[in-house]
């Protein structure tokens, strides 16, 4: 394996900084959004929804409200040119409403440890695109609502 380029090293540092901004009580959505380019976006693949501008931070706030102790455990973080790939898990205790496209899941008190893969593309040290692939069926099963999602939802 060849050595990382200075751009790849910088890109990895940018992504580690991005994750640090959304950890538990230290959550700083405004600074999280500021790391994106003006034309950048966040793509929540499971919901098939792209967010632009200030809305990039919406899912950060949704998950922070539902899981106030939210922590992202990074297993693998690798850069390839202007791309950074991250394998991680989203971890936390479900203590608040979880708003999803189908409705709202009230707090269950259960622990989530959902597998996730994030794919970033950077331009000049800022995030242009962030595609987030969360294993939603596993997340819903961990909350105890997967097999009976309709009964668990508030509309």
Predicted segments — roles?
Residues 11, 29-96:
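A solvent-exposed, acidic/Ser-Thr-rich amphipathic alpha-helical stretch
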Residues 115-135:
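A contiguous, mid-protein "functional segment" used to position or interact
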Residues 1-38, 151-155:
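Short, low-complexity N-terminal intrinsically disordered segments enriched in polar/charged residues
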Residues 5-6, 105, 140-145:
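A short acidic/glycine-rich loop-to-helix N-cap element
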Residues 71-72, 112-117:
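Short, surface-exposed coil-to-beta transition loops
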Residues 128-155:
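Low-complexity, intrinsically disordered terminal/linker segments enriched in charged
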Residues 96-108:
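Short, surface-exposed loop/helix-turn segments at secondary-structure junctions
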């Amino acid at each position: 394996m060849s050595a990382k380029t200075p751009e790849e090293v910088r890109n990895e540092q940018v992504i580690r900084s991005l994750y640090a901004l959304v950890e538990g009580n230290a959550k700083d959505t405004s600074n999280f959004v500021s790391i994106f380019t003006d034309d950048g976006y966040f793509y929540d693949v499971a919901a098939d929804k792209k967010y632009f501008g200030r809305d990039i931070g919406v899912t950060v706030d949704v998950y922070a409200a539902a899981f106030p102790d939210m922590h992202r455990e990074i297993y693998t973080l690798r850069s390839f040119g202007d791309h950074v790939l991250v394998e991680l898990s989203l971890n936390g205790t479900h203590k608040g409403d979880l708003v999803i496209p189908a409705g709202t899941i009230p707090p269950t008190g259960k622990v989530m440890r959902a597998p996730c893969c994030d794919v970033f593309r950077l331009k000049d040290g800022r995030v242009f695109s962030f595609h987030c692939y969360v294993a939603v069926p596993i997340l819903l099963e961990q909350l105890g609502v997967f097999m009976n999602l309709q009964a668990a939802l508030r509309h």
